[in-house]
Amino acid sequence: MFASFTPTEEKNVLSKYSRNLNDEIARNAIDPTIGREEEIRRLIEILSRKNKNNPVLIGEPGVGKTAIVEGFARKIVNGDVPDNLKDVEVVELSLSSLIAGTQFQGSFEERLNKILKEVKNSSGKVILFIDEIHQLVGMGKNSSNSAMDAANILKPMMARGEIKVIGATTIDEYRKYIEKDGALERRMQKILVDEPTKQEALTIMRGLRERWEAFHKVRIFDDALVAAVEMSARYISDRYLPDKAIDLIDEAAAKIKTLIHSLPPELDNIKQKIIHLSTELAALEREKKENHSNVRLGRIEQLKKEIKDFTNKQNELTVKWTQQKTIYECINKLKEEVTNLTAEIERLQAKGEYTQASKLLYLEIPKRQEEIEKKTKELSEFTDNLIKTSISRVEIAEVISQATKIPLSKLVASEQQKLLNLKNDLSKYIKGQDHAIKNVSDAVLRGRAQINDPNRPIGSFLFLGPTGVGKTEVAKKLAYCLFDNEKAMVRIDMSEFMERHSVDKLIGSPPGYIGYDQPGVLSDAIRTKPYAVVLFDEIEKAHPDVLNILLQILDDGQLTDNHNRLVNFKNTIIIMTSNIGAEHILANNPAKTIEELKRKIRPELLNRIDELITFKALNDKDLSAIAQKLLSDLSDRIKKQQINITFDKKIVENVVKHGSNTVFGARPLKRYIQREVENFLAKKIIENKLEKNKSYVCTFNAETNEYTLVNLRKAVS
C-alpha cells in the first residue's frame, strides 16, 4: 500500500528572498534620507490610490531612487504616514536570490507564486520594493524553460490590487523594457526623480556627515563637502549628483583612514634611510675585514653616527605617534558611544520612555562630549602632528585629480614655478612666434587658476601660417611642458577626414552600422585623458561637414558620442592648424588672409574660437636660432655615445645659408643638417676616428667646402 506524500509548505518564504527595510531602519543600519520630501509625498499618494497604486521611480543612476524608498520606510517606522499605511512593512525583493536554482521547469513560477501569496495574505501590510524592476521582463523564461516570465505572473495581481509594488529603474531601461510591455506600464504610475541641484546635494551630504565621521573615524570639514559637490559637478560629467559627490567624500575618508593605521610618512622615510645606511655600512665593514686597501674608514664612522642619529629620531617619533594614536582611539570610542546613545534616545522617545531618554540626553551625552573636547585639545598640543584625522578641500582635490588626471590639487612649489615659466620654456623650443606662445601660456594659467569659463574648453586657438613655421610644434611642446611627454597630446590628422561620412571615426559609427560597438578616436581619447592638448592638424583638408562636430565642443565644452554618452572637453586645450592664406601671409597681406579664411571656414566655427593666431614667416634671425637648436639636439644625441661635440657659428651660418627656404619654413634646415652634418659625423663614428670621453668642435671651411672636427691635440677632417 502506497501512501500519498504531500510536501510541507515552506514558511516565511518572503524573508528568505528579501530584506525588510523597516527592520533595518529600526536597527539604524540604513543611512537617513535627507530631503526628497516631494517625491516621498508623491509615493505615499500613489500607494493610497484605489487603482494604479504601484509607483515606479524613474531617474538616472545615482540620483537617489532607492534612498526615496528608504525614506518612505523610515516615515512608516516613525509613524509619519496616513492611517492606511501605518504598520506596513516595505520588503525589498532580491531578484538574484529569487531566480537562483530554478533550473527545472515550473520551479521559478512556484517560488514566485509562494512569495506573492504571502504578500497577498498580509492584507496590504506588505509592500514589495523591486529595485531594477525592468529585470522582471523576461525573468525566469530562459533559465527554467518557463512559459511565463515574472512580469506576466505579477500583472494580474497588480491589476486586481491584491499586491502593491514599488519599482525603481533608469530612464533608458524603462524605455527599453517596460514601455514595450504596455500592460505592465499601465499598471504602474511613474514618478520622475531628477538630479538634485548643487544646494540640495550639499544639504544631503551635510545630513550624512555624522554617519561618515562615525564610520571612518575622521572629521569632515564643511569646505570638503562644498568642494565635493562643486568639483564633481564640474569635472565628472558622466555621473550624477549626489552619488558622485558622496563617492569623493567616501574615497577621501578611506584614504585618511588607511594613513591613520599605517606608519606615518615621516617615520617611514627615516626607516628607509636607516635601511640604506645600514646596507652601505655592512658592505664597507665586510671590505674592512677582507683588508681591502681602498676602504674609507672615515665613511664608516660617519655612517655609524648617521644611523645612531636617525635611530634616536625614529624612537622619539615612535613614542609621539603611539601617544597620539592612543588619544585618537579614545576620542573615536567616545564618539561611538555618543552615536549609540543618540540612537537609544530615539528608540526610547518612540516608546514613550521620556524620563530615561532625558537622562541620556542631558547627562550621559554632555559628559562624553566634554571628554571628547578635552582629548581633542590634548591631541592638538603636539607640535609634530603625525596623525591626520580630518578631510578638507585639499583632500577632495587630490582624490578627483587621481581619478580624472586633472591637476586640481594644491600647487607645489615646483609646479607653480613650471606654470609661471611656461612661456619661457616654450620659447626655448619655438623660435620667432612669441605672440602665439604668450596667448597659449596665458590660457593654461587661466585654466589652472580655475577662473576660466567652466562650460567651455580652457582655450581654443586657430593657428594660421605657412608650412614649417612651428604651428604643430607649439602644440607638441605645450603637451611636453605640461605633462613631460609629447605623447600626452591627442593629435587628429584632419587629412584622414576628407569624406563626409568619416566623422564616424571621431565619435563612432551610428546604430546599425559596422563598428557601432567600437569607440570613436576622439571621444575615446578624451574619456581616457580628460586633461589634454587636442590638436586638429590641417583642418582645411577635412570635409566641411566634419568640422560641424567642433561647434558643440567649442561652445559647450562637450560632445555626444555614438552611444549617447557626453564626453567632457572642458579641461582640454583645443588647437587647430591651417595653411589657408599662406601665400598672403608670406606677402604680408593680413586682410586677404582673413578673406580667404572666411571663404573656406564657416563663420559659426570661426566665431566660437577664442583666438586666431597668425604665425609670421621666419626671418634669418629666427632660422639661425632654429638651426642652433637643431644642432644642439644633435649634440645631445651623440652624447649618449660618450662623445662631446659642439658646433661653432660657421656651421650655423652655413646651414642657414644653404638650408633655408622662405616658402617651406624650418623643415629644410632639418633636412640639410641630416644630409650634410649628420652624414659627416656618422662616417667619423663608424671609422672610429672619434674617441670616447673626448670633446670636439665641429666647424665648416667655406673655402674648401668641408666640415672639420677639432680637439685639443689634432684635427680630424
Curated annotation (Swiss-Prot):
Part of a stress-induced multi-chaperone system, it is involved in the recovery of the cell from heat-induced damage, in cooperation with DnaK, DnaJ and GrpE. Acts before DnaK, in the processing of protein aggregates. Protein binding stimulates the ATPase activity; ATP hydrolysis unfolds the denatured protein aggregates, which probably helps expose new hydrophobic binding sites on the surface of ClpB-bound aggregates, contributing to the solubilization and refolding of denatured protein aggregates by DnaK. The lineage of its organism: Bacteria, Bacillati, Mycoplasmatota, Mycoplasmoidales, Mycoplasmoidaceae. Residues 618-717 are annotated as: C-terminal. The keyword Cell division does not apply. The gene is clpB. Residues 12-195 are annotated as: NBD1. This is Chaperone protein ClpB. One of its GO terms (molecular function) is ATP hydrolysis activity. ATP 2 binds at residues 465-472. Homohexamer. The oligomerization is ATP-dependent. Residues 196-405 are annotated as: Linker.
